[in-house]
Amino acid sequence: VEIILKYFPDLTEEQRKQFAALYDLYTDWNSKINVISRKDIENLYEHHVLHSLGIAKVIQFRPGTSIMDLGTGGGFPGIPLAILFPEVKFHLVDSIGKKVRVATEVANAIGLKNVTFRHARAEEEKRTFDFVVSRAVMPLADLIKIIKKTICSDR
């Protein structure tokens, strides 16, 4: 957790507790359902959580903003971003049901109230969002083709 605090020192106590809980939760779930490379679980905070939060160094999402995390897998980048931005609404989507289950269980375990989940392919998402985030899902050109219809037209 120290690496998160190094880059985001102004976290509330609740956010600190939520980030701290992630390691044990993901280690437990990863032993049942492979959502993070077993060789990489020791680097959870540096390779997954901090990487997910990188966007927060260049943009501050306004309260009420809606963001879709496309191809969330076990909840990256959506869950770390939902912790960091508790007043922003996140919708996490993945085509693999067991990964959506892990993300849902992790979010529930740490008390996140600003996330919803959907087991679906990206092309099936009908709602629109202010932003779409994604991490290691597909080539960017392919991703752009899929998400064009999900971005609010005033963005």
Residue ranges and their predicted role:
Residues 28, 32, 45-63:
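Conserved alpha-helix/loop element of class I SAM-dependent methyltransferases that forms part
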Residues 87-155:
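S-adenosylmethionine
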Residues 23, 49-52, 100:
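Short amphipathic alpha-helical/adjacent loop interface patches that line ligand
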Residues 1-38, 42:
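N-terminal auxiliary segments of SAM/dcSAM-dependent transferases
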Residues 74-87:
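Conserved SAM-binding loop of SAM-dependent methyltransferases across substrates and taxa
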